[in-house]
Curated annotation (Swiss-Prot):
HAMAP family: UPF0122
Protein name as annotated: UPF0122 protein STH1464
InterPro entries: RNA_pol_sigma_r3/r4-like (IPR013324), UPF0122 (IPR007394), UPF0122_fam_protein (IPR054831), WH-like_DNA-bd_sf (IPR036388)
UniProt xrefs under PANTHER family: UPF0122 PROTEIN CBO2450/CLC_2298, UPF0122 PROTEIN YLXM
Role noted for this protein: Might take part in the signal recognition particle (SRP) pathway. This is inferred from the conservation of its genetic proximity to ftsY/ffh. May be a regulatory protein.
Family under the similarity heading: Belongs to the UPF0122 family.
Highest taxon above the source species: Bacteria
Signal peptide feature range: none
Species whose genome carries this gene: Symbiobacterium thermophilum (strain DSM 24528 / JCM 14929 / IAM 14863 / T)
Amino acid sequence: MKDVQRIALLFDFYGPLLTERQQELIRAYYLEDHSLAEIADADGVSRQAVHELIRRSEAALQEYEQRLGFVAEHQRRLRLLDELQEALDRADLSAARRALAALRAEA
């Protein structure tokens, strides 16, 4: 997964755990595609300050995922749903039942 996509996904899950400032910077840089210079100019700080805070925010998001694993679990469930859909499309009921059982085991 590309870094931008990964950070966006982590932000979807863990963004509320960041400070408001961290959320603003991640949103501006990754979701609104502003450059470091644009953000720095708008905030009246150095480009380096913005860069460092974004990197710390990224590290915090990665740390939350490492500890909680919600994104990995979400992706695993999406894969199981894909397997279930494929099995149903093939009319492979035994494979569909296995995928469904795996999903139910999580509930």
